[in-house]
Amino acid sequence: MTVARVMVPVLTLMNANGSVDEGACSAYAERAGATWLDLFLVSGTIGGGESSTPTVRRRVLELWAARVPKDRLLACVWAPDDLAHAADCGVRPIVVLRDLADAAAMHSVLAELPADAFVYSHPNYTPTTFTPAVAETARRAGMQPAGGKICKVSLDDVRDLRAATGDGFQLYDGRCRHVAESVRAGAALMCDERGVPCHLVCAQAEADAPTEHRSTGDDGLAVVVDLPIAPVIDLSTRRRIA
């Protein structure tokens, strides 16, 4: 698997009748795949995954997996069927932690995850989140996930999570308000929940970013949220407009 440096949530482009706009999604995926960005999160919150159906999520994942190398994709898992869909497509799952009452429930979920799975931890979805204490227990028990997008955490939390998980865990801080500090604290790189990265890959842009914006794998900071790429998506409707 590629060790991702920049994770970008992508949109789900829909027709006015509520069906997947397969032509727009396909063109969007092809354009995204031609950029320098490392990893694309399919059917996440920005992609409307929470409110879409398993059938829609499956079809969108199929479209992306046919056009972008699978090791550059993460399939957001909102329901059990999504996990099977990700396996069918050969895409790494990122499992949303939902409605976990306590640490024991969390550990039960972690114990059942595929070895390459990521987790998506957000207090909006579960009262028990992926904390440093949970992470340390999971690591000692041999059930630590491969990585995770961990939301609503402080810089101290990022440092503690990095210490608890070790260097092999791909840690993504779900906030984008303190990018450099988060990377120094141990995060791999940022995910932007405000929609900015969607503009980076919605694109009328050259495939190669300027040298100073590329992710080389050696940079202390490689995320960019201000490339000169014209958006072609109406974010309110998730439909192509140009």
PLM feature segments, named:
Residues 2, 7-11, 28-29, 35-37, ...:
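C-terminal alpha-helical cap/extension of soluble enzyme domains
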Residues 112-118, 122-218:
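Catalytic alpha/beta core domains of metabolic enzymes, predominantly
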Residues 2-130, 134-142, 146-147, 231-240:
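Active-site beta->alpha loop and helix N-cap motifs at the rims of alpha/beta catalytic domains
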